[in-house]
Amino acid sequence: MALPDGPKASSVWQMLQWILRPFSFLRACHRQYGDCFTIRLGESRGTLVLFSHPQALQVILSNDDAKLFDSPGALRGPLEPLIGTQSVMGLSGDQHRRARQLLLPPFHGERMRSYRELIREVTERVMCEYLPRQPFSARHQMQTISLRVILRAVFGLNEGIRYQQLEQLLGTMLDSLSNPLSAGFLFFPTLRRDFGALRPWGNFLRKRRQIDRLIYEEIADRRAHSDPSRKDILSLLLSARDEAGEALTDTELRDELMTLLIAGHETTATALAWALYWIHQLPAVRDRLLQELESLKANADATAVFRLPYLNAVCSETLRIYPVSLLTFPRVVKSPVQLMGISLEPGNTVAGCIYLVHRRPDVYPDPEKFSPDRFLERHYSPFEFLPFGGGVRRCIGMAFAQFEMRTVLSSILTGFELSLIPGRAVRHRSRGLATAPSPFRMEAKRRLPQIKT
């Protein structure tokens, strides 16, 4: 059975388009082929049938029972050099279910909310580094906040030598992967040859070894000096047990920590940078948001930010208009199925295109416009709005990411007055494994009197 139509260019050329110009590539495919088309991304991603209609996504994401569709970890693609083979993203079947069951508790309820003061403290300290009115890169600032939150809330590190070493090494490694050309070895496995520390792959391997050494040292220290009172995610994972009473191995812990880092650092920083841009690009949005934030009491509980409708709408619209992840996790067809009039056979690989779903004018009128009110006027199904993916492969850190985004924004906006520094038009662009706004700069000063959050 023939697959749906798609670009006729070679898989290498399509992969280069995907790496360098993913947005225009997807839009061009959609204009020519409609809501379903096939792309060929070579050795790292293979052949994918992409769907951008909510009805198709409902079928795909609601049938993850391995009867109609399966989501094998082998489809983790270019992420394996970063996250390893034992993380929740790289596992399948019963192993994947076990990993999710062990990982979910730290990201829900009071455990997650206990991180509010930590997030606020990190945000305050980072923002104060550029006072008064020192221009700063918005995205770099948000990356710093995101990385420090992960090191403290996930890794459980306090400031010290190991913290400083990991911050420097992780920051440098992740920044190097933000260049699509430098990150080429992730997309083309044949480029993974060690020609020394001055070449991209060799440099990556050396930094990864240093990072792994520090992570394994931290795991060993925690095992040797167990402290039940600790609430960081590494401590909770160390004490977690599956249904058989088995704990996570050191390798599993390392891979899960790196997965949480890769999944949570770049995505959260990008979403925060975009939010700051739109809020300050559109004064009406900023003023309305500040008015709502003033209603927060100084002693409000940690979940109060989720009860602010306009803040929630601004965050949702930010994640809609420029989703960090362009596709859902791929699924493999297990049984013959008709999807939107397309016949799919076992072995075909399908994915939902989040970017195109979020740009559908029949779902989101005037989709190019930043309009938080759309999320106040109607409810969107999980197949129309899915910035964190869906089904059994939905991002496990979704609740934490949403909580962090709202807490950071409320802390910045109530504590500081920010303004955009005029420059080139801000556009969305590819950054290796993710997407991000093009560089833009801001300046900040203390908001007086300071509003407590």
Residue map of PLM features:
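Cytochrome P450 heme-thiolate "Cys pocket" and heme-binding signature region
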Residues: G84, M258, A263, A302-F306, ...
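Cytochrome P450 catalytic-core helices
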Residues: T267-R286, L290-E292, A399-T414
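Cytochrome P450 fold signature focused on the C-terminal beta-domain
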Residues: S226-K231, L290-L308, I321-I342, A351, ...
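Conserved cytochrome P450 K-helix E-x-x-R motif and the immediately C-terminal K′/meander segment
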Residues: M15-F37, R213, E217, A300-M340, ...
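N-terminal membrane-proximal hinge/A-helix region immediately C-terminal to the signal-anchor transmembrane segment
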Residues: M1-G84, M89-R98, R113, E117-R125, ...
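Cytochrome P450 proximal C-terminal region
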Residues: H30-R31, T123, G171-T172, E294-L296, ...
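Cytochrome P450 heme-thiolate monooxygenase catalytic core
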Residues: M1-P4, L68-L79, Q95, R111-T270, ...
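Conserved cytochrome P450 K-helix/beta-meander segment immediately N-terminal to the heme-binding cysteine loop
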Residues: G352-R378
